[in-house]
Swiss-Prot record:
It comes from Streptococcus pneumoniae (strain ATCC BAA-255 / R6). One of its GO terms (biological process) is pyrimidine ribonucleotide catabolic process. Its EC number is 3.1.3.5. Its cofactor is Mg(2+); Mn(2+). Disruption phenotype: Cells lacking this gene are viable, have normal growth and morphological appearance under standard cultivation conditions, but have high sensitivity to toxic non-canonical pyrimidine derivatives such as 5-fluoro-2'-deoxyuridine (5-FdU); the growth is completely blocked by 2 uM 5-FdU. Upon exposure to mutagenic agent 5-bromo-2'-deoxyuridine (5-BrdU), 5-BrdU is extensively incorporated into the DNA and results in accumulation of random mutations with high frequency, which affect growth or generation of lethal mutations in essential genes. A 30-fold increase in the mutation rate is observed. The lineage of its organism: Bacteria, Bacillati, Bacillota, Bacilli, Lactobacillales. Nucleotidase that shows high phosphatase activity toward non-canonical pyrimidine nucleotides and three canonical nucleoside 5'-monophosphates (UMP, dUMP and dTMP), and no activity against IMP, UDP, GMP, AMP, UTP or pNPP. Appears to function as a house-cleaning nucleotidase in vivo, since the general nucleotidase activity of it allows it to protect cells against non-canonical pyrimidine derivatives such as 5-fluoro-2'-deoxyuridine monophosphate (5-FdUMP), and prevents the incorporation of potentially mutagenic nucleotides such as 5-bromo-2'-deoxyuridine (5-BrdU) into DNA. The active site is at 9 (nucleophile), 11 (proton donor). Its main location: cytoplasm. This is Pyrimidine 5'-nucleotidase PynA.
Length: 237
């Protein structure tokens, strides 16, 4: 299969969300006078991941996630806080974090040289993702950035990809590849939309989901090799 349009997930695929989250949380917790910051982080991080999974499964709304995660955090430690206000402060700090994964810029440079059209396709809050992208220096690589909040739908919904396709000139599913680390969002989303996928799996995780990636890679070099192999097969054919 010869691909032209590459849709990239951002967090944990190109952007270092863990580093960004750690800095933003530290700033927020210091602002709130928290003494044992690590204890709060240890509770918040898995709780937040679980809430995002619930959002993917449509068990909760985005508004509920955003407005309650910090009130839940502080409630766990016996404090009553305005979750909505804390969410605004956290988003302010997080939007300033543009840490990228090692090699991300080189990867995108290589793909541009190979004449691919690159697009960002991310679940998230517009103000945060646009801010982080601006800080990261990745914006010039992308023809367009698609954010779930703006599209009013999110991965893994097929509608997310349908709306993206409507905005890309010459778009065809057969020439499109979704690249990301999340089986339940990126890969399942590609499956739902009828789009081929690359599961970026640098930690060699096992797949215990129903999502079926077209390809699986463990590094950026693997990703390039996978795409180069497809080009060679196309030329040979």
């Amino acid at each position: 299969m010869f691909y032209k349009f590459l849709l990239f997930d951002l967090d944990h695929t190109l952007l270092d969300f863990d580093a960004a989250e750690d800095v933003a949380l530290t700033q927020l917790l210091k602002e709130e006078g928290v003494a044992d910051i690590q204890a709060y982080k240890d509770y918040y991080v898995p709780m937040n991941k679980a809430l995002w999974k619930d959002l993917e499964l449509k068990k909760i709304s985005k508004q509920e996630l955003v407005n309650t995660r910090f009130s839940r955090l502080f409630s766990h430690f016996g404090q009553e806080k305005d979750g909505s206000f804390l969410a605004q402060r956290y988003q302010f700090y997080l939007a300033q974090q543009g840490q990228t994964l090692s090699g991300a810029h080189d990867l995108l440079d290589s793909l541009i040289e190979r004449d691919y059209d690159l697009y960002a396709a991310t679940n998230g809050i517009t103000a945060i993702q646009t801010g982080r992208l601006a800080q990261s220096g990745l914006v010039p690589y992308f023809n367009q950035v698609f954010i779930s909040e703006q599209l009013q739908t999110q991965k893994p919904d097929a509608l997310f990809y349908e709306k993206i396709g409507q905005q890309i000139a010459g778009f065809s599913k057969e020439k499109t590849l979704m690249i990301g680390d999340s089986l339940t969002a990126d890969i399942q989303g590609g499956n739902n939309a009828g789009i081929d996928t690359i599961w970026y799996n640098p930690h060699h995780l096992e797949n215990h989901t129903q999502a079926q990636p077209t390809y699986e890679v463990y590094s950026y070099q693997d990703l390039l090799d996978c795409l180069d192999k497809n080009i060679l097969e196309k030329i040979t054919f």
